[in-house]
Curated annotation (Swiss-Prot):
Active site as annotated: Y194 (proton acceptor)
Reaction catalyzed: (6R)-L-erythro-5,6,7,8-tetrahydrobiopterin + 2 NADP(+) = L-erythro-biopterin + 2 NADPH + 2 H(+)
Residues the entry annotates as binding substrate: S175
Organism: Leishmania major
Family indicated by similarity: Belongs to the short-chain dehydrogenases/reductases (SDR) family.
GO MF, one example: 6,7-dihydropteridine reductase activity
A single BP term in Gene Ontology: response to methotrexate
Protein name: Pteridine reductase 1
GO annotation, cellular component aspect: cytosol
Superkingdom of the organism of origin: Eukaryota
Keyword NADP attached: yes
């Protein structure tokens, strides 16, 4: 184990998009970073190599499925026995301590996002078959797992490892950031389970901030609006969304969101906890 001389950040979903920007920003601020990924191994390993080229021994990658399914794999598991989500989350935090002896920042960024309509019948108008119901249960486990339950287990593991660390080995600035959604109170049609999960994450942010305040661990949320838009939506649809953003009539860049995360992780925000900051250009003020 390397002597714990620099602060360490664990970023989930760090291989691409917002997660990558957050990890790069924290690394630029002097953090060593643990880059979690699920399926994006090539991207995560490439980012780790880039960061280690800038500063040796400053980045590692760890794979884990954060859906709430007991049989999902974990790095190093032989697959012979189910591995619970609780265990997977504990192992992510443990990876930071194994490699660097500490974990100062946790960013819960990993998030599944896709529609789960309440009313979805087959072509003949019948109720979904058993296979469809099983698919819905899997989607629920995935969406709630990545967006709410995994963040809870990760925060729990983060706090327990902090409490078990001798005072002389602790840092001076501990922060947890949950990536919420600026539009939770103006839900996107058909995304019911995702919206439920993000609402739960906001509640977790406030509750954990209250419970962990005596340990001087700050917990905040950052809620992007239109940010790093996906490639598979028709351009005309995205332009329609962009035109409704009061400020600049565009989506945010990844850096504009990650800059807020990095600020909330810094000592400049040491009196801020339990709040959720919207980074949406005012978009949540307009959509009914």
């Amino acid at each position: 184990m390397t002597a714990p001389t620099v602060p360490v950040a664990l970023v989930t979903g760090a291989a691409k998009r917002l997660g990558r920007s957050i990890a790069e920003g924290l690394h630029a601020e002097g953090y060593a970073v643990c880059l979690h990924y699920h399926r994006s191994a090539a991207e995560a390993n490439a980012l780790s190599a880039t960061l280690n080229a800038r500063r040796p021994n400053s980045a590692i990658t760890v794979q884990a499925d954060l859906s709430n399914v007991a049989t999902a794999p974990v790095s190093g598991a032989d697959g012979s026995a189910p591995v619970t989500l609780f265990t997977r989350c504990a192992e992510l935090v443990a990876a930071c301590y194994t490699h660097w002896g500490r974990c100062d920042v946790l960013v819960n960024n990993a998030s599944s996002f896709y529609p789960t309509p309440l009313l979805r019948n087959d072509e003949d108008g019948h109720e979904p078959c058993v296979g469809d119901r099983e698919a819905m249960e899997t989607a629920t486990a995935d969406l709630f797992g990545s967006n709410a339950i995994a963040p809870y287990f990760l925060i729990k593991a983060f706090a327990h490892r902090f409490a078990g660390t001798p005072a002389k080995h602790r840092g001076t600035n501990y922060s947890i950031i949950n990536m919420v959604d600026a539009m939770t109170n103006q839900p996107l049609l058909g995304y019911t389970i995702y919206t439920m999960a993000k609402g739960a994450l906001e509640g977790l942010t406030r509750s954990a901030a209250l419970e962990l305040a005596p340990l001087q661990i700050r917990v905040n949320g950052v809620g992007p609006g239109l940010s790093v838009l996906v490639d598979d939506m028709p351009p005309a649809v995205w332009e329609g969304h962009r035109s409704k953003v009061p400020l600049y009539q565009r989506d945010s860049s990844a850096a504009e969101v990650s800059d807020v995360v990095i600020f909330l992780c810094s000592s400049k925000a040491k009196y801020i906890t339990g709040t959720c900051v919207k980074v949406d250009g005012g978009y949540s003020l307009t959509r009914a």
